[in-house]
């Protein structure tokens, strides 16, 4: 299945792409407003791609159907994870990356980004993708299926530029989950740029400024 997407180009003939995944229950429109805050029109020739997650039943939501990248069985660190859901979504995100390479943007000029569920997927795909990516921005999320990463990781992205951010007052995904994920990544040799902010499960202006700095650095 090809995901429906929203695209914003900041200048003609984009030479880089940012594929940005929304959180649980949201859609691709959720992060459209951040584009002009991150890059001024004409400053860089970037293509922002905001896919819509498909609708699926979510166990944590009483089995109700909503836009989700994978099923959530529980928020406890010991809860089972939807391995099949991650793999299916991973295949869809890879299609988006390959669509960009087909349009002339090499994988090394592609950043994967995401918030909450979308951030977890971005980490999952970026660290397993067989070609070097420009980086990954994982916001208010966690590292999924950490026990599998050591055997499934792609050497091409061992040096991946990873931006992680979390809210100190996040009651939905407590910052302890983000910190544990950061520490796991570091223990596996990944370099993580970590930021934390006095916010809940959201995004704040200071974070957007740091995202801008990160993107300007990895997509010069």
Q: How does the language model describe each region?
A:
Residues 163-166, 170:
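Short beta-strand/loop motif that positions the catalytic acidic residue
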Residues 40-43, 153-159:
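Short, conserved loop/helix-junction motifs that constitute active-site signature segments
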Residues 16, 160-161:
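Alpha/beta-hydrolase fold active-site loops
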Residues 52, 113, 139-140, 165, ...:
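Alpha/beta-hydrolase-fold catalytic nucleophile elbow
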């Amino acid at each position: 299945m090809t995901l429906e997407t929203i695209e914003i180009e900041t200048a003609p003939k984009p030479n880089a792409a940012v594929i940005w995944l929304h959180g649980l229950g949201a859609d691709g429109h959720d992060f459209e407003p951040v584009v002009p805050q991150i890059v001024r029109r004409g400053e860089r020739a970037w293509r922002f791609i905001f896919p819509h997650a498909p609708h699926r039943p979510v166990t944590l939501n009483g089995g109700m159907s909503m836009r989700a990248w994978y099923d959530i069985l529980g928020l406890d660190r010991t809860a089972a994870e939807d391995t099949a859901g991650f793999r299916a979504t991973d295949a869809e995100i890879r299609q988006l990356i390959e669509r960009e390479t087909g349009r002339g943007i090499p994988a090394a000029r592609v950043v994967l980004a995401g918030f909450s569920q979308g951030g977890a997927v971005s980490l999952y795909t970026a660290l397993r993708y067989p070609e070097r990516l420009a980086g990954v921005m994982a916001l208010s999320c966690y590292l999924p299926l950490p026990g599998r990463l050591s055997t499934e990781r792609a050497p091409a992205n061992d040096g991946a530029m990873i931006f992680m951010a979390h809210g100190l007052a996040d009651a939905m995904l407590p910052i302890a989950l983000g910190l544990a994920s950061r520490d796991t990544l570091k223990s596996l040799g990944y370099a993580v740029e970590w930021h934390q902010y006095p916010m809940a499960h959201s995004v704040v202006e200071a974070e957007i400024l740091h995202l801008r700095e990160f993107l300007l650095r990895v997509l010069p």
